[in-house]
Amino acid sequence: MEIAQVLTQLERWDRAAAVPRLGGMARADGVVIVGRHHWAFARTDGSLTEGTMPVVPSPLRALPFARGLLRLAGSFAPLFRRRGVARGRERLFLAAVILLPLGLAFAPGWVGLVGGIATTLALLAWLLRGRTLYLHGAEHRAIAALEERRLRETWDGTARPSRFSLRCGTNFATLLLPVAVVGGRFWPLPATSVSPLIVSVLALALTMELWTLVQESRRLARVVLLPGLGLQRLTTREPRLGETRVALIALASVLRRELPQ
């Protein structure tokens, strides 16, 4: 997108009565912004990649637990699309990181522990590449600017919305841990070889339901998600204006296609 087009979109949405709910993710070289139907990846080198989100059948969107798992899976779509954000080897790495913990559920205790630590360290190394933490803060700031109708001010640098977000995946992760522990401890059925896998999937689904529920009340969300908000002080850094603009370009691209004039 040309800068003039970006600014037109920002000014348009500053005047909007209602705005769509967007999500996103940060990478070492840019920011991905995700809408219901479209996503965009703006890179720090000025390039832009656009794509569409997978279509979820309407009946499944209203089905408790299934809708959460589908929403979670859909959030990874920009990474795994053939012409998406990640390249071939990176897609394989991410698939391994996602699937390995499920496989470790069947492993002996010490194997699962070692595998879990190795997986966590590998994922942290991937997340901490380049300026990911700064771009993570920029992603949050761009979305907050949309919700506060301060997009143009944020582009100009005269406004600095929060770099912390209630909808950040960090909050989801910190909520998932206690849910998974409690689920494993109080699993009511006789233990079998597949019990750990079932508990893991149900924990993900239940956490998504809880995560969605608490966000309906901003005050409740701030209390329940306080550990995640605290952890964001480690997973985000104060972005430069140029990095915030990268996120705003991705955001403008999604808005232009989600709700065209």
Regions found by a protein language model. Give the residues of each.
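Residue-level signature of catalytic and energy-coupling elements of molecular machines
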Residues: 30, 168, 231
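Membrane-interacting alpha-helical segments
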Residues: 62, 66-81, 139, 143, ...
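Juxtamembrane helix-loop transition segments at the membrane interface in multi-pass membrane proteins
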Residues: 40-56, 123-155, 211-232
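Transmembrane alpha-helical segments and their cytosolic interface motifs
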Residues: 85-104, 161-185, 190
